[in-house]
Amino acid sequence: MHTFSCLLFLLLSWSTVAIAADSRPDFVGRQVCASCHAAQEKLWQDSHHDLAMQEATAATVLGDFSGKEFTHAGTTSRFFRKDDRFMVRTDGPDGKLADYEISYTFGVAPLQQYLVAFPGGRLQALGIAWDARPQEQGGQRWFHLYPDERITHDDELHWTRLNQNWNGMCAECHSTHLQKNYDPKLKSFDTRWSEIDVSCEACHGPGARHVDWARKKPGWEQHAGNRGLLMVLDERQGVHWQPDASTGTARRSKPREGSAEIEMCARCHARRSVISPAYVHGEPLLDHYLPRLLDAGMYYPDGQIQDEVYVYGSFLQSRMHQAGVTCSDCHEPHSLQLRQPGSGVCLQCHAADKFATAAHHFHKADSAGASCVECHMPPRDYMVVDPRHDHSFRIPRPDLSVTLGTPNACNVCHRGKSAQWAASQVQDWYGHVPQGLQNWAGTFAATRGGDPGAGESLLQLIRDSGTPAIARATALSQVGPYLNAQSLEVLVQGLWDDDPGVRASTTGMLEQLPAGLRVQLALPLLEDAVRAVRIEAARGLASVPTGDLDDRQQALLEQGIQEFIDSQLASAERPEAQTNLGNLYVQRGQLQQAEDAYRTAIELSPAYTPAWVNLADFYRSRQDEAAAEKTLREAIAGMSGVADLHYALGLSLIRQQQAAAAVTELQQAATLNPDSDRYIYVYAVALHSTGKPDEALLVLQGAHNRFPNNTDILGALVAFNRDQGNAEAADRYAKKLQSLLPAASPWPVQGTDRSRIQGD
């Protein structure tokens, strides 16, 4: 209670914290740029980049602070003015109402968020935002970003908690030359920027040398080649799109030779992890960030956007990317507006007489169905009111909606119709089902469902050079359960792929190989051109004994280990990073550092389950099962309904010969997470082991109905039915198991400790 009382005092008594501007001499500021580039500055003014973040003033605040009230989760918040300040009375970190001053606005349309200063240099994003859309569109109102969830002060999504912290979650992409400056010892921030918004040098890089070149200052000649710019964005220079009458689609006059522009945009328009202490303009994206693959929960099996993944991952899947299209082919890079309104931007390259006709789209002119974007870039709403378009430019596939439940553009408009109706319409129009480029939905759906027969289709996908690299990288990341001689060959090829994302994904799989083979394959990757590959290689080699390597190899490994540590310290305020450090220290035998890292993760976010589970597993590995159990019970006391914790506790109790208590915990885990075939299987085995074979069989039969291709469940059904004398049932399950086993024939892998959870 003392801690919260002190904190409440601070909340009520501090003055607004101003974030300092950084005046590093290599960043010169927009005004200097505008002295030569006035036209570009004019386009940029009032753009979303210009208005990305602003001090809260009467000119910048869009929300109604006239005493308006808004109620969510039982808390009524009031927005009001106090002299020239904008204030909100709402629930704070202790759940009590208090008055907070709005320090900054964040964004402008279709919503505007507000930032509040807290001790330790923190800015927190209020969970209630202003709907900036016109009133006739439902806007001009306060709304909660999680309208269907009861977000109270003890929830991880509450506005005062870590996941709504501006410094670590938002700041880098809303200001120029943002330096987070987190101090792990003080657990505080000294965040600085060169400019508050996304200005010229956010994209073009520091301009001091460019100014020296332009003004012919002493030594300017040495910068003449790139005009003093670290980021040279010239991929469209001297390029035109040549119409092709036979296809109706224009072709780039020369191949795109680099990806500087796309990667520059991807820095903020991608779902990614930070892997370096400081971004350097002009260096490869994967030297500083690791973009998410087409993972479950992030993307649908066919690659359509699902979670808030922005646009980079979807664009990499597209024919546009393969054809050499860059972001600025469609978007004017200063105003951010489309180069032509509506379908006009598409018709720059796609002939209107071929594509803007009913013969192509089968809809009335000027209807939504005749819009290129509505059909090929269907939107998905984020932050309640912000529709964002999928940039994979795909052919609508309602047939996949029928078989896999993925969304499709047709039913976005035709909400009253079924997916089968839409699929039949497409079949009637074309006489077949147009496939498009993205043909991996069935494969990824199978791997996500644990289908043991999915291995062969994964290999086919990986081997197809026409498949976008991000899909091949995703497939390689899913090879683990299907490792055999064939897939090992594909893995080895992936390590030397031209695409760094493919190499990084493949390198991450090496930890599942036997130690000797892993060392043989991973050592050369410590010298890869990009950091993302090097740190994955180092992580996979972290447990290799020093004596197994020569001096040069050991030096390379130590360098890679340090790069990995630095990559995690770049997000030291996050529990995921601290958990990853703990895992590394365990592999390295640095036990005190491992325990400290896990405990730091828990301190940063007591609701972060992997840190608790890994700390308990750390104690188990030291033969301190009592400490492991105590850790898990402490976690469960603070978090109700977390399956992973009950499962880990059940295993701990089994190791302590407390079988009856273990069954209770394992049952709880299986109940809380009925989608986990592993939890249900282990629960059934525990029932059988405690003399409850009939109950075990009932659980297994139910599990088999849900997971018909799970070989562990089938194997247990064979064994348990034989034990019960059910020969017919045992034989039936055995035949099915045998039919699946050849496809699931595993490569003999070195068991990575499956109880240790990586931070995400």
Where do the protein language model's features map onto the residues?
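Amphipathic alpha-helical scaffolding segments comprising HEAT/armadillo-like alpha-solenoid repeats
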Residues: 452-462, 484-496, 514-526, 548-565
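Helix-start (N-cap) detector for alpha-helical repeat units in TPR-like alpha-solenoids
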Residues: 469, 500-503, 531, 575-576, ...
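Short coil turns that delineate tetratricopeptide repeat
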Residues: 572, 606, 640-641, 674, ...
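Primarily the internal scaffold of c-type cytochrome electron-transfer domains
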Residues: 31, 39-107, 113-119, 127, ...
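Register position in tetratricopeptide repeats
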Residues: 512, 540-543, 587, 621-622, ...
